[in-house]
């Protein structure tokens, strides 16, 4: 979890992981962290759509870390996705310090 190569923004952005919609906890040009009931194993390949700056951006990535939740007490798990493919415009926007103010 500490091998990040880019700054993260504490933003709740709508993304999909496959067909499942989730919200990010934080996001940056290198990837994002999300909270969900069922986490995927580290190393799993994922793809989906980011909704940023009023546009959809497709991505591909890999699960970098996970922390399983506990369904018995309705505690969600968390996982981090490292981008392996991201459109250049989306990466540029996510690197921008102004991203925190963009809807």
Labelled PLM ranges:
Residues 38-45, 92-93:
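Surface-exposed connector loops and short turns at secondary-structure junctions
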